[in-house]
Every structure is written in structure tokens, then in C-alpha cells.
């Protein structure tokens, strides 16, 4: 018989830097999950990623206090800010542009995000990422 699911927990944790402090500790502690076990497993799984990049994770907690988790790719906004060399998007994206991204940068981000995007083709994924860039106040070259 399958284990009964008690909760789903969605968090964004920096790759390779999970520790028991907030937000990880309180979110897992209230469900009775072994926090250090999660931190060690998460850090091991995100070891190949660039340290410090926020990584979305969905933790499934079962009624016997065991858990499984699934990591997603880094949010597109974070990758776009890194590619454009800015710290935050524009407060007025339609009138005030804060940076520029090229087609090559968009393709690189789309490749990294393709598993999490619903786009069937690479061109559609690039257009999706370009739309995110425009909504952040970035100029998009070549699309």
C-alpha cells in the first residue's frame, strides 16, 4: 500500500546552502520532518549547480514523517538578472529599461529551463523567456 501524503511544502532554497534556519527549519519542523536529513540530501543533490542560486524545491511529506523532494531549475527572473548584470528589475518596465539581454543569452537560459517550461520547441521556450525579460524591464535583442 502506498504511503499517505500529509503535506506538500514549496520552498526556494539556495543551491548547496540548505541549513536548519528559516525558511527550511520552521517549514519542515511543523510537519515533523528530520530537518538535517533534508538539508544533507538537498545539498548533495544541488552540488553540481552554482552555489547560492535559489532553487525551487517541492517536498512531499508522508504520514510516517518520511519525505521525498523534487528540485526544479532556477527561476527565469534570477537567470535573466544575472545575464543582464542587474540586481533588480525595473519598477516601470514599459517606460524605464534597466538592461539588455541578447538572443544567445535567452537561448542559454531557455536550455537550462526547458525541463520546467511547457514549450514543446526551443523557439517557443526562447519567446517565453523573452516575455519574462520584457516584463522585468529588459531590452531584448534579436527576438
Swiss-Prot record:
Forms part of the ribosomal stalk which helps the ribosome interact with GTP-bound translation factors. Belongs to the universal ribosomal protein uL11 family. Signal peptide: none annotated. Keywords: Methylation, Ribonucleoprotein, Ribosomal protein, RNA-binding, rRNA-binding. Pfam families: Ribosomal_L11, Ribosomal_L11_N. Part of the ribosomal stalk of the 50S ribosomal subunit. Interacts with L10 and the large rRNA to form the base of the stalk. L10 forms an elongated spine to which L12 dimers bind in a sequential fashion forming a multimeric L10(L12)X complex. InterPro entries: Ribosomal_uL11, Ribosomal_uL11_bac-typ, Ribosomal_uL11_C, Ribosomal_uL11_C_sf, Ribosomal_uL11_CS, Ribosomal_uL11_N, Ribosomal_uL11_N_sf. It comes from the Bacteria. One of its GO terms (molecular function) is large ribosomal subunit rRNA binding. SUPFAM superfamilies: Ribosomal L11/L12e N-terminal domain, Ribosomal protein L11, C-terminal domain. One of its GO terms (cellular component) is cytosolic large ribosomal subunit. One of its GO terms (biological process) is translation. One or more lysine residues are methylated. This is Large ribosomal subunit protein uL11.
Amino acid at each position: 500500500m502506498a504511503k499517505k501524503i500529509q503535506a506538500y511544502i514549496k520552498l526556494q532554497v539556495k543551491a548547496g546552502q540548505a541549513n536548519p534556519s528559516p525558511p527550511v527549519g520552521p517549514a519542515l519542523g511543523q510537519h515533523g520532518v528530520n530537518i538535517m536529513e533534508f538539508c544533507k540530501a538537498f545539498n548533495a543533490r544541488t552540488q553540481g549547480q552554482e552555489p547560492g542560486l535559489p532553487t525551487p524545491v517541492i517536498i512531499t511529506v508522508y504520514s510516517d514523517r518520511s519525505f521525498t523532494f523534487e528540485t526544479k531549475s532556477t527561476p527565469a527572473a534570477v537567470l535573466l538578472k544575472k545575464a543582464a548584470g542587474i540586481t533588480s528589475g525595473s519598477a516601470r518596465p514599459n517606460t524605464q529599461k534597466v538592461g539588455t539581454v541578447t538572443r544567445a543569452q535567452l537561448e542559454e537560459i531557455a536550455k537550462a529551463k526547458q525541463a520546467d517550461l511547457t514549450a514543446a520547441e526551443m523557439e517557443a521556450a526562447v519567446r517565453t523567456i523573452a516575455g519574462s525579460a520584457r516584463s522585468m524591464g529588459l531590452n531584448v535583442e534579436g527576438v
